[in-house]
A protein has these predicted regions:
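Membrane-interface helix-boundary motifs at transmembrane edges
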Residues: 6-11, 38-41, 66-78, 131-138, ...
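Hydrophobic cores of alpha-helical transmembrane segments in multi-pass inner/ER membrane proteins
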Residues: 51-64, 117-126, 185-203
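Hydrophobic core of alpha-helical transmembrane segments in multi-pass integral membrane proteins
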Residues: 19-32, 48-65, 151-155
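Hydrophobic alpha-helical membrane-insertion segments
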Residues: 140-157
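Membrane-proximal helix-loop-helix units in multi-pass membrane proteins
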Residues: 84-140
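A glycine-rich, hydrophobic loop/mini-helix early in the fold
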Residues: 40-103
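N-terminal membrane topogenic signal
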Residues: 5-21
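Short, membrane-exposed interhelical loops at transmembrane-helix boundaries
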Residues: 164-184
Length: 212
């Protein structure tokens, strides 16, 4: 008798495949973080550009071809895609590094408080979406846009306050510590992951305009 895959089985398989990919990506990120992928001072920040571009390109291609790599992510409901970004409270480590004198406030304060705000609000926005409260769709759009803007601002501040060729605002205390392990895991893994989650959430919002 021919085996029939139920929707629940298909979803479980897709989630397992995507989770395996994320674990492998994280382990690769740890290896990269331990091997200084951002280059020497004074050089263009090609490292961060590649680290951001590769997962985004793979995600775009996989989505275009309806591939299996990120199918689990695409199958998550909107509330789950938002709730998982509670991990952004990890931005508190930027504030700890600032207090310790290893990161400049011009970078650490907006990046740290921005991530904290996004991470702390994620469960509440997700709950509003799951309960289909009035205005939840607009709230979800706003939250995703603010979350992406926070990431863009942090990347801009990190690069321009570094000792790279684009470090036009670098002072006596550059942002180079964020390029060293363990802080480097944030731009290497957690920032690209957050971008993918925002994109997946906004695609779901756009696909279901009447009911997020």
């Amino acid at each position: 008798m021919e085996n029939v895959v139920t929707p629940d089985q298909g979803r479980a398989t897709a989630l397992a495949t995507t989770l395996s990919l994320l674990v492998g990506w994280f382990l690769l990120s740890v290896w990269l973080a331990l091997h200084d992928p951002f280059g020497a001072p004074g050089q263009p920040p090609f490292g961060i550009a590649i680290i951001l571009a590769v997962p985004l390109a793979v995600f775009a291609l996989d989505s275009r071809l309806h591939g299996p790599l990120f199918d689990g992510l695409r199958r998550l409901d909107l509330a789950s895609l938002i709730a998982v970004q509670a991990y952004r409270i990890g931005g508190v480590f930027f504030l700890v590094a600032w207090r310790a004198g290893t990161l400049p406030g011009a970078f650490a304060l907006p990046a740290g408080f921005g991530d904290l705000a996004v991470g702390l609000s994620a469960p509440f926005v997700a709950a509003a979406v799951a309960a289909r409260r009035r205005g939840a769709r607009a709230l979800a759009w706003t939250w995703n846009i603010v979350g992406l803007a926070d990431l863009a601002n942090a990347l801009f501040a990190g690069v321009t306050h570094s000792r790279s060729a684009l470090g036009v605002f670098a002072g006596s205390l550059p942002s180079d510590a964020v390029g060293r392990y363990p802080l480097s895991l944030i731009p290497i893994f957690f920032v690209p992951l957050a971008i993918l989650l925002h994109i997946a959430a906004m695609r779901r919002l756009r696909a279901a305009p009447a009911s997020p």
